[in-house]
Amino acid sequence: MAVRRLGAALLLLPLLAAVEETLMDSTTATAELGWMVHPPSGWEEVSGYDENMNTIRTYQVCNVFESSQNNWLRTKFIRRRGAHRIHVEMKFSVRDCSSIPSVPGSCKETFNLYYYEADFDLATKTFPNWMENPWVKVDTIAADESFSQVDLGGRVMKINTEVRSFGPVSRNGFYLAFQDYGGCMSLIAVRVFYRKCPRIIQNGAIFQETLSGAESTSLVAARGSCIANAEEVDVPIKLYCNGDGEWLVPIGRCMCKAGFEAVENGTVCRGCPSGTFKANQGDEACTHCPINSRTTSEGATNCVCRNGYYRADLDPLDMPCTTIPSAPQAVISSVNETSLMLEWTPPRDSGGREDLVYNIICKSCGSGRGACTRCGDNVQYAPRQLGLTEPRIYISDLLAHTQYTFEIQAVNGVTDQSPFSPQFASVNITTNQAAPSAVSIMHQVSRTVDSITLSWSQPDQPNGVILDYELQYYEKELSEYNATAIKSPTNTVTVQGLKAGAIYVFQVRARTVAGYGRYSGKMYFQTMTEAEYQTSIKEKLPLIVGSSAAGLVFLIAVVVIAIVCNRRGFERADSEYTDKLQHYTSGHMTPGMKIYIDPFTYEDPNEAVREFAKEIDISCVKIEQVIGAGEFGEVCSGHLKLPGKREIFVAIKTLKSGYTEKQRRDFLSEASIMGQFDHPNVIHLEGVVTKSTPVMIITEFMENGSLDSFLRQNDGQFTVIQLVGMLRGIAAGMKYLADMNYVHRDLAARNILVNSNLVCKVSDFGLSRFLEDDTSDPTYTSALGGKIPIRWTAPEAIQYRKFTSASDVWSYGIVMWEVMSYGERPYWDMTNQDVINAIEQDYRLPPPMDCPSALHQLMLDCWQKDRNHRPKFGQIVNTLDKMIRNPNSLKAMAPLSSGINLPLLDRTIPDYTSFNTVDEWLEAIKMGQYKESFANAGFTSFDVVSQMMMEDILRVGVTLAGHQKKILNSIQVMRAQMNQIQSVEV
C-alpha cells in the first residue's frame, strides 16, 4: 500500500510552473487610480513607495479614533478574459493597534475583500450597494506583521503580501472592494490575475496552454497531439490542469515513428541520419546499417542491401545482408548399373549464411539430339532431391545405357531473392546395363475349368530389349515354394493343367540380356467350376446345333463360331468371387484396382447398366429445380433419401421424353462408365432410375459447378498453392482412370466439377468412345457427332484418332493453363485450323500471368510432341506434391529458360495506337465489362487512362484482383508505348 500511495503521489507532482495572466496591476499606473471610495472621509489615494523605493499609487485609511468605521474602496471594472478562477495578490501594511496611544477598543488590524460580477461597467457611486450583499465576500485579510511607532522612526517597512482566489466567475467582468472597519493601514499594491497551465511537451506530445478550472480542486483534461514524426501508443494522450495552473497526472504517450529517433530530451523526433535506421516505433536511438547494406535517404526504416546482396524474408533487419553461395566443389560420382552415388565438398563461399542446402537437378540426355530433358518422377533420391543438408546423395531407378547430367545446386536463404540461377557443379555419367523393372499390371483374358489365359503390360522401364517373360504360379492354399514357372516370348500366356474352381497366385517378370527383373505383385485368379462350365455349354449348344444344320459347306465357319462363343461364354461365366479376385493386386499395384470395361462391348447394353449402376426407386428421389440442360435432357438439383441412410443433395440428369432406344442406350452408357469408378477426384454415381419415367442418372452434387466458369467468377482470388491443390486433385483422378486403362478423350476445365471444399472431380464421360471409321471429317467429328475439342486434344489424336492416356496428359496440360489463367480460352481467338498449324510448327502456349515457371515447365512436358516423352499421371501427381511440400519452388515466375526449347505463342498486350477509343482497348484486353465504368469516371482518353493508378482502378469499380492486375499491367505497357513514341518524335 505504501508503494501504491507513493506512485499516486508522483503522478500528482506538477510538471511545470503555472503561467499567470495579469488582469489588473495597480503598480503599473502612471496617474491616479481613481478608484471609488465610500464614504469620502475613508480611503485616501496617495503616492507612496514599494519595497524597492519605487513611486507607486496607494490607498490608505486610519480613522482609528472614530468608532463604527465602514470604509469601502472599489476598483474599476476588470474584464475576466475567459478566466474561471480569479486570484488577487495584495501588498499592504498595518499599524499595530497597541502601538497607538489612547486608541479605542474598536481599532482593527484586518480588512475584508469582496467581489461583484457584471457583464459591463455599471457601477455608480451608490450601486452596487456598499454592503456584503450584493457583494460576495472572499475573505478577511489579516497581517502577518504590523508596524509600530518605533518602526516609523527607523523608517522600517513591514509589508505583508497575501493572495486570495475566488470562483467560478461567469460574467464578462467584476469589481473588487476592500472594506475597512476601524484599522490604520495602507493598501500598497493590488494585482489581479488568473492562472493557466503552460504549453508543454511531455511524453512525446504537445499540450497547448489550458485555463485552470473554476475550483481549486478542479482538474481540466487536455488532449495532446504527438510531436512531428511521432505516433500515439497505449491510450489517448492526456494531461490534467489543476486549479492552480499546474499540469498533473500524465496519461499515455507518443513515441517516435520507425525511422526517427528521440532527441533534445524527447521533445523532437529526428529522422535517422544517413547510414542508420530504426525499424520500429520507440524512443530508442537509430542504429548503424549492418554489413553489406546502406540507406539512400534520411529517416530510413531499414537498410537496403548493396548490389549482389540480399535479405531473406525471415532475416531480422539488423542482420547483415548476405549473398548466394558459390558452386559446390570436388564432385565425385560412382555409378553402379542404374544407380549413382554423388559426393562433393561444400562451396568455397557460403554467402555469409548458415542455412546452406543442396538441390539435385537430373537431366536425361539419351535422345541423341543434343538436347537434355528433365528426368521423370520415376527416379528415386535418397534421402531426397531438394534441401539436402549433407554433401552426398544416392540416386536409383535410372534408365540403363543412358547419359545423364546431374547439377548439384548450392542454395541458401537468399537464393530465391537473387535474379540469377543458383551456382552449381555438374557431372555427366552414363548408366550401365540393368535388369528390367517390374511388370505393373496383369489381367485375365479368359478361363476354363483347367486353364487361365493371362496378359500383362510391358515394364515401365524395360532397360533394353525384352527377351522373354517368366510366369510363376501356385495354388493360393499352398506356399510359394510349390510354385511352377513357365516362360513366354510374348506378354500373353495360357496356363494349362489347373484344378477346377481353384484360386491361383500369379507373378510375372521380364528378362533382358542383363537378366531377370523383379517379380510383379501377386495376382489372384480362379478357374471355372464344373457346374459353371456345363452351364456355359448348355447356353451355347442350340447355337452349335442350329449352325451345323446349314450343311457341310458352313461346317468350318460353325466350328469357328462355336469356339468363339464358348470362349466368350467362359469369360462371361466368371463367378462373383473371381470377378473380385481377378482385379486384386498386391505389391506394386494399388489394392482394389480394377480394369475398365467398355459397356459398348456388351451384347445387351442394359446388362452393363445392371452390372455397374445401382437401380434407385423413384420414390427416393426429389427433384427441386432445373440448373441446366444436357445433350439428352435437363440437369436438375434435388435430394436423395435411401432407406436407412441420411438424405443427401444430388445432381439429377433426366432423359427427355420421346427418346429413341439408341438415345436411351447412349444416355445410360455414361452411368455404366461412372459406375465402375470409385475415387475422391472422380464424380461419384449414386445410381440410376430406369424402371420409371423419366429415366435418370443421379450423381453427387458439386456446389461450385464447372471449373472454368468457377475460375472466371473468382478471377485472382486464390493463392498459387490453392490452384496447385486443384490441379493435384485433377491429376490424381486422371491417374486413377489411367490405371484402370480408361481414356477420357475430353479432359477440359469445363468437364471438371468443383464442390464447396474446392475439391475438383473429373466428370463428363460422353466422349470416351473410339471415333467412328465412317465419319466424313475424322479430324473434327467424334463418334457422337460433335466436334473434337481441338484446343484440348493431342496432335496424334487429331491426326490419327489415336486416343491414349498420353493424349489425356496433353489435355491435362491445357487444363493446367486454364486453371493458372483463371478460365481464359486456350489459344484465345485463334481458329481451330490456326491452332493445329501452330502446334504442328512446335509452338506452345506461353505461361499465364503470374504463373510459376515450375508449373509452366510441367505444361510444356505434357505438350511433348512425342507422346512417349510425356509424363504419366502418377509422375504429375508426384511433381505437384513436391511443389505443395516446397512452396518456395513456386516463387520463380515464368518466363522460363526451358531445356525443351519450344517456341511460345506471342500473346502480348496490343499497341494502344491501333484502337480509336478506350472502349475498343478494353475489349481487346478482355475487360469490356468495365467500359461504362471508365466512361462514367471520366477515363475516356488514352492520355487520361495512361495516368491511372491502383486507387483509380479501385474507384472505377474493378474489385477482382486478377482484373486489377491485368488492367494495371496493360496501362503500364501503354505508358511504355507512349514514351517510345515521344522518344522517336524527339
UniProtKB/Swiss-Prot annotation:
State the tissue distribution. Answer: Expressed in the epithelial dark cells of the inner ear. Expressed in the region of the proximal tubules of the kidney nephron. Expressed in myogenic progenitor cells.
Extracellular-side segments? 19-543
Residue numbers marked as site, Cleavage: T535, S536, I561, A562
The lineage, from the top, is: Eukaryota, Metazoa, Chordata, Craniata, Vertebrata
Modification after translation is described as:
Autophosphorylated; ligand binding stimulates autophosphorylation on tyrosine residues. Ligand binding induces cleavage by matrix metalloproteinases (MMPs) such as MMP7/MMP9, producing an EphB2/N-terminal fragment (NTF) and a C-terminal long fragment (EphB2-LF). EphB2-LF is further cleaved by MMPs, producing EphB2/CTF1 which is further cleaved by the PS1/gamma-secretase producing EphB2/CTF2.
Provide the Eph LBD domain boundaries: 20-202
Q: Where is the active site?
A: D746 (proton acceptor)
Instruction: Enumerate the spans annotated as Protein kinase domain.
Output: 621-884
Return the GO cellular component terms, semicolon-separated: axon; cell surface; dendrite; dendritic spine; glutamatergic synapse; hippocampal mossy fiber to CA3 synapse; neuronal cell body; nucleoplasm
Q: Which residues are glycosylated?
A: N265, N336, N428, N482
Keywords per UniProt: ATP-binding, Cell membrane, Cell projection, Developmental protein, Disulfide bond, Glycoprotein, Isopeptide bond, Kinase, Membrane, Neurogenesis, Nucleotide-binding, Phosphoprotein, Receptor, Repeat, Signal, Transferase, Transmembrane, Transmembrane helix, Tyrosine-protein kinase, Ubl conjugation
Query: Which part of the chain is the Fibronectin type-III domain?
Result: 324-434, 435-530
Transmembrane domains' residue ranges: 544-564
Q: Which enzyme class, named as a word?
A: transferase
- Naturally occurring in which organism (per UniProt): Mus musculus (Mouse)
Instruction: Name the reaction it catalyses.
Output: L-tyrosyl-[protein] + ATP = O-phospho-L-tyrosyl-[protein] + ADP + H(+)
Keyword Membrane applies: yes
Q: Where is this motif: PDZ-binding?
A: 984-986
Note the Gene3D superfamilies from the entry. ephrin a2 ectodomain, Galactose-binding domain-like, Immunoglobulins, Phosphorylase Kinase, domain 1, Transcription Factor, Ets-1, Transferase(Phosphotransferase) domain 1, Tumor Necrosis Factor Receptor, subunit A, domain 2
Q: What is this protein called?
A: Ephrin type-B receptor 2
- Stretches assigned to the Cytoplasmic side: 565-986
| Membrane topology type | Single-pass type I membrane protein
Tell me what effect the entry lists for Y596F: No loss of interaction with SPSB4
Q: Does the keyword GTP-binding apply?
A: no
Q: Where in the cell is it found?
A: Cell membrane; Cell projection, Axon; Cell projection, Dendrite
